[in-house]
Amino acid sequence: MSRVCQVTGKRPAVGNNRSHAKNATKRRFLPNLQTHRFWVESEKRFVKLRLTAKGMRIIDKKGIDVVLSEMRARGENV
């Protein structure tokens, strides 16, 4: 399972660890992914999404129906 948010599309970013001596070693910044079940009243079913904390805030703001319709318009299988 890839580490990609289904709502925002955020994925791991690459950067550097920096020691006190300013040595650089490669590292990955992983998104804050959570698996969450949402009740979709219009479809009378639960939808399980893998999304970031920011994606949950977007659903709180817009509503699950709007977000699902945007995801389906992008071609995401939900």
Curated annotation (Swiss-Prot):
Any matching Pfam family: Ribosomal_L28
Signal peptide (residue range): none
MF GO annotations: structural constituent of ribosome
GO cellular component: cytosolic large ribosomal subunit
Annotated stretches, region: Disordered: 1-25
S-S bonds: none
Superkingdom of source: Bacteria
InterPro entries the record matches: Ribosomal_bL28, Ribosomal_bL28/bL31-like_sf, Ribosomal_bL28_bact-type, Ribosomal_bL28_sf
UniProt keyword list: Ribonucleoprotein, Ribosomal protein
NCBIfam families for the chain: L28
Classification via PANTHER family: 39S RIBOSOMAL PROTEIN L28, MITOCHONDRIAL, LARGE RIBOSOMAL SUBUNIT PROTEIN BL28M
Name of the protein this chain belongs to: Large ribosomal subunit protein bL28
Organism: Aliivibrio salmonicida (strain LFI1238)
Gene: rpmB
